Structures are given as structure tokens and as C-alpha cells.
């Protein structure tokens, strides 16, 4: 849909999704969980033009599944993903990535992933 003159192009104004009820993460995050978060951050950082949004969503969803399993807390999962997203190069200068939009995308995808907990996280 093409926005009209009266519609805002400011993607940062989108309301944030509600935070899901999630299990408490362990006091110490398992090294394998941290490796998976680092891998997601790396994938986001290296995402090429045309694949950035999909890469951000896929990585955040995958980490969200670990959040849902209780392997990592919501904030510990979202923070590095958001930082990687904000650092993405904006290939389209007319639509630069904004912190608010990245935060919205990450929280939404992590929340959706948390609704489908990763069964492998139970053995971490």
C-alpha cells in the first residue's frame, strides 16, 4: 500500500507488541545459548541489501524460541539484536533504519518465537 500525503512514513511510531509472559531465565546463561545469540547478531550484521528485514525477523524469531524455553531472558535476547539492527547499513536513504522501528521488529519477532519454545533449549 502506498501512503497518502496524510499518512506518516515514520515507522518508529508503531506501537510495541505486548510483552509475553515468559519463564524466568537461568541465573547463568548457557554458553551455547550465548553462541546462538552471537550467531544471530552476526547474521544481522552481514545481511545484504534486500535481505536485511528478513534476516532481522528470522534471527529474532529463532532467539525468541530460546526465550520461550527459559534459556535466556527477554531483555538479554533483545538488546544485542536491537544493537545489530540499528547498526545495519541503510541501503535506501529514503527509508533509513530507525531505532524505534528496529526495536518494534525485534520485540515482535522475539515474542512470536517465544510462543513456540525451542525444545532443544531444555537440554542446555
Question: How should each PLM-predicted stretch be described?
Answer:
Residues 1-124:
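Modules that initiate DNA replication and primer synthesis
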Amino acid at each position: 500500500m502506498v501512503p497518502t500525503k496524510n499518512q506518516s512514513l515514520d515507522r518508529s511510531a508503531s506501537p510495541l507488541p505486548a510483552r509475553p509472559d515468559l519463564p524466568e531465565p537461568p541465573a547463568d546463561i548457557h554458553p551455547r545459548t550465548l553462541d546462538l545469540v552471537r550467531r544471530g547478531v552476526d547474521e544481522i550484521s552481514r545481511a545484504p541489501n534486500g535481505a536485511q528485514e528478513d534476516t532481522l525477523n528470522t534471527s529474532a524469531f529463532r532467539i525468541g524460541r530460546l526465550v520461550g524455553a527459559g534459556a535466556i531472558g527477554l531483555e538479554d535476547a533483545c538488546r544485542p539484536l536491537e544493537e545489530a539492527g540499528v547498526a545495519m547499513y541503510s541501503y535506501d536513504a529514503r527509508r533509513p533504519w530507525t531505532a524505534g522501528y528496529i526495536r518494534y521488529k525485534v520485540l515482535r519477532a522475539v515474542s512470536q518465537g517465544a510462543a513456540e519454545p525451542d525444545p532443544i533449549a531444555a537440554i542446555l
